[in-house]
Amino acid sequence: MKKMVSVQRLLAALLAVLLLCPMAACKKQADIDQWEAEEKERVYSSLTSGQYYDLDGRYFYLHDTGLYERPIVICFWKMDRPESLNALPAFQKAFERYGGKVQFLMICTYSENDGSGSEDAKQWIEEKGYTFPVFYDRDQILLQRLRVEKLPYILFFGKSNELVHIRNEALSEGEIDTLIADILE
């Protein structure tokens, strides 16, 4: 009799887990959606007024002519953050697949106080064989303005300059493909 009760409890617990797992996944997606909606409002004005630097030290703004001819993916990353570095191979593959349709801005943020700078990042990128375009946020001015707390920090802009998605975690190739499909619509 005790075994029967134990088996019934085990089955009840298993059934509860099976029923709650999809609900938890939905809640996670709902949490992401809510966070993203709040983040979009906060980020948009700060981001479009920011100043960016290319490999040669020339600066530009996101509203510069021609930048919005295609959808844009902006990924903020940092040399001393392993999660940032681990995210870059998936973005390299996405750049290879979508580089003709989507503008990629891979922004390495650094501070000279960190002990690394643009030359360190440039050398590392060359060693890894990355071909996506890299830009720099000197002294983390944009990160501070955006109040970014976790890297990588990724923004997906659609064709009409609309901020469609924001993520603050490393993404798989499949996740990047899905988010890029949204901005290509």
Model-derived regions: residue spans:
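Bacterial N-terminal signal peptides that target proteins for export
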Residues: K2-L14
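C-terminal motif of bacterial Sec signal peptides marking the signal peptidase cleavage site
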Residues: C21-A25
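N-terminal "domain-start" segment that seeds a small globular fold
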Residues: A30-D64
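Short active-site neighborhood of thiol/selenol oxidoreductases, capturing the structured segment around
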Residues: Y61-L85
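Hydrophobic beta-strand anchors of alpha/beta hydrolase catalytic cores
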Residues: V73-I74, F104, I154
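Structural microenvironment flanking redox-active thiols in thiol-disulfide oxidoreductases
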Residues: L85-E127, Q140-Q144
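Short, internal strand/loop/helix patches
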Residues: K122-F157
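Thiol-/selenol-based redox modules, centered on thioredoxin-like
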Residues: F156-E185
